[in-house]
Amino acid sequence: MQKLMGLVRRCVEDYNMIAPGETVAVGVSGGKDSLVLLQLLAGLRQYSNFKVEAVTIDMGLGMDYSGVRKMCEKLEVPYTIVETQIAPIIFDHRKEKNPCSMCAKMRRGALNQAILDRGIHKIALGHHYDDAVETFLMSLIYEGRISCFQPVTDLDRTGVIQIRPMLYIHEKTVDNFASRMELPVVENRCPVDKITKRAEIKDLVYQLSSTYPDLKERIFGAMQRYPLPEWEPKGRYKRPKDQE
C-alpha cells in the first residue's frame, strides 16, 4: 500500500492537484478503481494536510452500497449517497440506443452538484494509467483527434475542479490491490457494461501489447514529453515501471 500511496502522492505533486487544508470529494461508483482511490487518498491524509469525503451517485439500478458505507466508516470518511433515476430515464423512458455519452453527462452533472451542495469544489476520479492510454486511442480512432482527459480539469462554468490522482498506477496493480484488500466492490448492473467502445479499445491494446510490450508506456510517455494540454508534469516525473 505504501508504494501505491507513493505513486498517488507523486502524481498529486507533479500536477499540483491538492492544496494544503483542502477538502477533496472522491467520486465512488462502487467499482474497484474508485474504491482503491478512496483507500489510497484516505491513507495519504496522515502525510498531507487535506480532508477526504466520498460521494456516490445512485443511478437507480438497485445497487447495494452497504459495503462501501462500512468501508467509509472504517476509514472515518464522511459518505453521501445521492439517489437519482438516471438509468430508468435513459433505458426505460428515452430508450437510448447509444446511452453511454448521455449517462456520463447526467452522472457528472449530478456528482458536481452533490459536492457543491456540501461546499466542496474538488472531485477526485478513479482514472488510472491504462484509462489514459485507452482514452487517447479512442479519441484518435473514433474521432480523429489527438486528445485525452487532463490530469487536472477546471470546469469553469460549474466551479468544480476534477483531479485524477491514480494516473501513475497500472490497471493490473489496481485489480490486485482491490483483491488483496478485499474491497467491497459493488456489482455493476448497467445493461451495456463491457460492450462499449472503451471495451473494444481495451481489447485492441491487449492484442497489440503482445507484439509491442512497451506500447502503453510509449503512448503515456508521448502524452507527457510532447504534452497534450496540461499533461506536462511540474515535478520530477519518472515513467511508472512494471508495478508487479
How would you name each of these model-derived features?
Residues 51-52, 130-210:
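Catalytic subdomain that performs nucleotidyl-dependent activation
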Residues 77-98, 160, 222, 229-242:
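Mobile, glycine- and charge-enriched loop segments
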Residues 6, 10, 14, 70, ...:
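Charged/polar, solvent-exposed surface patches and flexible loops
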Residues 104-116, 152-158, 205, 209-224:
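Short, basic, helix/turn surface patches
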Residues 1-134, 142, 172-180:
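ATP-dependent adenylation/nucleotidyltransferase module used to activate substrates
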Residues 58-60, 85-87, 155, 168, ...:
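Short, solvent-exposed coil/turn elements at secondary-structure transition points
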Residues 183-244:
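The feature marks non-catalytic terminal segments
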